Amino acid sequence: MQRGKFITVEGIDGAGKSTHLAWLERFLQDKGLEVVVTREPGGTALGEALRQLLLDHRQAMHPETEALLMFAARREHLDKVILPALDRGAWVVSDRFTDASFAYQGGGRGVAQSKLDNLEQWVQAELSPDLTVYFDVPVIVGRERLQSTRVADRFEMESNLFFERVRQAYLQRAEQFPQRIRVVDGSRLLAEVKTAVAEIVEDFWSDLSDTQFRG
């Protein structure tokens, strides 16, 4: 059986990434694929428990503790959800993955990239998403969207400066991995953003089909 593909969706809080997950799931299902939609932190019983701890605004923690908890949740996520799904041929779509750790704990909190690199290698070995769609919005746009949706969690309560560091870290990742990370202007009209996402996913699908045909 052919191994499934791994797609991740990234962006600062309020970028609108979650809005497009349902569309992406339907697109892949229409191709006749089994699709597993999940999220980080979370995706497993332990991961969801860690998520509650990480998002609780009453719970202060050292930046490196935060990074370690994120990767602990990720290890469980890989073992219980992501790898089994990929091995049986399913496609996995995750709301955030390791790029978020480099952006939030690295860029936002200042955890050294070398430490995150080591954690990534230890937890994931050679596993990396096949495609990442990053929704980029100015910090002020993301903040305005959040203010009208829900009570802020521990990350959402951070300053604009924090989110600017996170955003810049994401953009640096996109420059570092241009073949994998595709940037979408999330500040555009919803219909325009959907069109951009559709083009990216269609191109990815076409490239896969061409490769399989040649093989």
UniProtKB/Swiss-Prot annotation:
InterPro entries (UniProt xref): P-loop_NTPase, Thymidylate_kin-like_dom, Thymidylate_kinase
GO molecular function: ATP binding; dTMP kinase activity
Entry keyword set: ATP-binding, Kinase, Nucleotide biosynthesis, Nucleotide-binding, Transferase
UniProt EC number: 2.7.4.9
Kinase among keywords: yes
Catalytic activity, reaction form: dTMP + ATP = dTDP + ADP
GO BP, sorted A to Z: dTDP biosynthetic process; dTTP biosynthetic process; dUDP biosynthetic process
Uppermost EC category: transferase
Signal peptide: none
GO CC annotation: cytosol
Binding site residues for ATP: G11, I12, D13, G14, A15, G16, K17, S18
Domain of life: Bacteria
Entry function: Phosphorylation of dTMP to form dTDP in both de novo and salvage pathways of dTTP synthesis.
Family: Belongs to the thymidylate kinase family.
Record protein name field: Thymidylate kinase
Phylogenetic placement of the source organism: Bacteria, Pseudomonadati, Pseudomonadota, Betaproteobacteria, Nitrosomonadales
